[in-house]
């Protein structure tokens, strides 16, 4: 009889726990936009943490600068860096729209007609399955037509105002929340600790501290990597490929942003950068680019992006992934493979931060489990006990 009572009590306990989790999940889903703003603000505050720490050391004749002013300067610095990326990319788009005219397109078509014909002949010769009438440009056009749904443009234009309005609200919300997270770095910890039982509060504080240290270093490293990759690509495109300075800057920073996506991001950025470089060379009203033939110029562009990626793999990524979040390359590779298989390429952007959070939680709350204690030793955490 007693066993039945205990079993019933345990069952009721688990049912209440499941109901509580379902309720919390439902609330999170209802307010997913608000949660997204908060999480983005947390990321911004983590990126801004080193800047804030540096500013706090500044004394003017023994007088400390007010904390709110330091937070405002830090936030403006981060927003300035993000705005710089956007401002540098916009001229590239505007220059392409301005310089590429119908006449230039016809001239570009004549310039690449012979190389494209040779490529089609090569493909038909070595890949007979493609058929005698295969043309690469036609195949690409058909695939693009499948992706682009022309009938959906009317609804897209109709919802543009709503999208802009929502985007504006989102930007304001993130900036507002980020300011308070930067100003009071313990605010997020207090919010989370208020939701956990008293017996878990100390462990939760340590876990949040560890997560904050690791993710701050990671996001700072990723930001440095973006600018490092952009700098190398800019120098290559400007000095070697001889593209204009504005075009080189725009393409370089675009490839730096794409580089955030592990593994396939550099390929996407390099491919798009090569295409944009070719468009600028052969469709621009003003002559740009090294005076070589089509294939040589294409090879130069590819070589620039490959060299940058080589430096990134040898220098930047080991410092960011291995040093900043204290994980081995094998761990990172397996995590990215799993997440990429489940959620696709874009989900790989958040794979490492999520893995870092889960790793710290596992150690702090389940460190007594043998498998976890062996796989995640204590020296892999930054915070001191």
Give the role of each language-model region.
Residues 160-276, 280-282, 295:
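Alpha-helical transmembrane segments and their immediate interhelical loop/hinge regions
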Residues 286, 290-385:
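Hydrophobic alpha-helical transmembrane segments of membrane transport and translocation systems
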Residues 41-48, 178, 254-260, 264, ...:
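Hydrophobic transmembrane alpha-helices
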Residues 61-74, 132-137, 201-204, 246-247, ...:
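Membrane-interface starts of transmembrane alpha-helices
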């Amino acid at each position: 009889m007693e066993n039945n009572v205990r079993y019933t009590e345990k069952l009721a306990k688990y049912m209440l726990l499941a109901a509580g989790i379902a309720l919390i999940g439902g609330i999170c889903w209802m307010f997913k936009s608000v949660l997204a703003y908060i999480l983005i603000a947390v990321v911004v505050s983590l990126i801004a943490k080193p800047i804030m720490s540096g500013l706090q050391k500044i004394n003017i004749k023994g007088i400390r600068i007010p904390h709110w002013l330091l937070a405002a300067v830090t936030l403006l610095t981060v927003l300035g860096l993000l705005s710089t990326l956007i401002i540098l990319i916009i001229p590239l788009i505007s220059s392409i729209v301005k310089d590429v005219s119908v006449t230039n397109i016809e001239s570009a078509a004549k310039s690449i007609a012979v190389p494209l014909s040779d490529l089609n002949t090569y493909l038909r010769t070595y890949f007979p399955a493609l058929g005698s009438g295969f043309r690469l440009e036609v195949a690409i056009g058909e695939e693009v037509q499948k992706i682009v749904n022309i009938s959906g443009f009317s609804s897209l234009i109709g919802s543009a105002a709503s999208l802009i309005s929502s985007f504006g609200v989102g930007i304001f919300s993130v900036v507002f929340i980020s300011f308070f997270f930067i100003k009071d770095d313990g605010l997020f910890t207090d919010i989370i600790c208020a939701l956990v039982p008293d017996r878990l509060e100390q462990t939760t504080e340590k876990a949040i501290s560890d997560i904050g240290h690791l993710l701050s270093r990671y996001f700072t490293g990723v930001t440095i990597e973006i600018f490092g990759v952009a700098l190398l690509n800019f120098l290559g495109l400007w000095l070697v490929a001889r593209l204009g300075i504005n075009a080189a800057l725009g393409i370089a920073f675009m490839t730096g942003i794409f580089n955030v996506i592990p593994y396939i991001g550099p390929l996407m950025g390099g491919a798009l950068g090569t295409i944009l470089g070719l468009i600028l060379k052969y469709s621009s009203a003003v002559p740009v680019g090294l005076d070589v033939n089509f294939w040589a110029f294409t090879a130069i562009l590819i070589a620039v992006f490959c060299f940058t990626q080589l430096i990134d793999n040898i220098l930047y990524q080991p410092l960011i992934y291995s040093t900043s979040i204290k994980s081995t390359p094998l761990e990172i590779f397996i995590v990215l493979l799993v997440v990429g298989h489940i959620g696709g390429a874009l989900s790989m952007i958040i794979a490492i931060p999520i893995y870092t959070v889960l790793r710290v939680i596992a150690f702090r709350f389940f460190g007594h489990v043998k498998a976890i204690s062996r796989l995640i030793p204590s020296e892999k955490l930054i915070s001191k006990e």
